[in-house]
Amino acid sequence: MDTDYTDWISSFNEVDTTSLKICLKRKLADEIDYLQTVAGPDLQKFIQMVRHKYMIDNVINIIEGCKNKTAKEIIEARSEPLGYLPEISGLINLDVRKIDELYEDVLIDTEVGFYFSAFLEDVIANSEIKQISTINNYLQELKPEKIKNHLKKIWLEHFYQFSQTMNGTTREFMEDLLKFEADCQAIQIIYNSLAYDYNQFQEEERKKLIPYFGRLFK
């Protein structure tokens, strides 16, 4: 085998689909690392905001893994290389019995802390939850997938706001890409909700998770 991935793949005694997937993701992350180092300021910012999506995935993976007492090695193996965070090891070792403290004391200090901070503000603003103990109980019961969808909505809207600061063709391309991503999220949320009995409450809950832009947005 003579490709750009040869050195990576040769490190495995046997190449199965899982190992190959891990290898290719790491190689892709390395290539994007290089691209980011030689890019201009706007492209660097764009790439970094793309990576925020995978950082959010990694943090949610850690929260879910810790709550389920998943082995540290398995949690690390599931991490997306494109979403690498220096704080990952520290997060994995945290006691998540008080999950609100994890959000407030640790995640807000990470690069994607802005999204988690905005998420917590939304939780408090859109509910009767005011006491820290009540927030902790609420977050413990909330499914990680719903937290992730909420965070992705905040990320997409923040990314879209950034695209509006660009000019000309750059702005047009970024808008098209982000609208496509927003539509994909909207479709996924609606599809996942079809398993439940449809009612007015559920419709309102879905709207909270769908970005305010995109070709499907009304």
Model-derived regions: residue spans:
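N-terminal domain-start signal
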Residues: 1-218
